[in-house]
Amino acid sequence: MTVSAIKIIEPGEIQGLPDKDMPQLVVPSPKHLFAERASRLEYLAKDGELKGWLEFCAMLAKAQSEVIDKVSVASVDDSLITGSLKNHIPPLSISTWKVNEEWSTVYQKFTEQLAANKLPQKATESIAAFSKLSPDDQAKQVIAFLNADEASVRPEYAPFIGAALQLIWTKRAEQLAAYTEFYKGESSLCPVCGSHPIASVVRTGDRDANRFMACSLCASEWYGPRARCTNCETPIEVSILGESQEDSVQGECCDECHGYLKLMLQSKDPMMEVMADDLATIGLDIALSNEGFQRTGRNMYFLSGGEQETKTS
């Protein structure tokens, strides 16, 4: 891949404040989310060197879509939601969550659905190996991955842990649909759960030309000013790196912290799905790494492979 750097204009010039009627926080509809993700992954897997990898990821998303209606989570108190959002505290913070029966039930339902869909042998062996761990060791793996302590996580367990955690958090985040208007502000971490973004996306429709951060865990999206580093929040403009200006997925790269987050332009590919298109553009990650930049976004289907300076909620 040929990577070229294109400097963008100052943050204040590229975009001012969002329109007052534009939603600044959007929470997911899990059933549609996972079905669309599976469909997009199946489409992206048709050709190219990543065919096998994307087919496996499509199986994960398909199982998520098939099991999501069987997932039940505890309800969240109304006053906790409104109070937290008003005070810029994630109401579903990962920092206070513990591995519990809810997790065990969701993980079991998810992996049983995967087994019914005829997983590759290596994936089946990884699930079996995880099941042989003691409950304490399982919990350590889950909590480490949830909190982005990726060095402590076995890579073969990551896709299954991550997918099950997404089932829980998207279902929990769905409960906030009636309260999103209480969120006003800016955040580099998800205002719903406190997780890292997977990428930023410039949407069309009622959020036309505005940049939103997409959560890697709960799939909520929140407004973020363009041309600003989402990792260190320096006022210095970021660079856009990619094969060409016409690419629908590029890298927002910061010369201060040397981190990058993918930028996805829905206007260039209306069918894009943030997590799926992140998985399909691993070549861009490799190219940006070769340019000296470190990935700051997360994808719950794999480990990023580098030490990430992790913000906490």
Residue ranges and their predicted role:
Residues 3, 26-27, 67, 71-76, ...:
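Extended aliphatic helical segments
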Residues 18-177:
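N-terminal alpha-helical interaction blocks
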Residues 173-292:
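Cys/His-clustered metal-coordination modules, chiefly Zn-binding fingers
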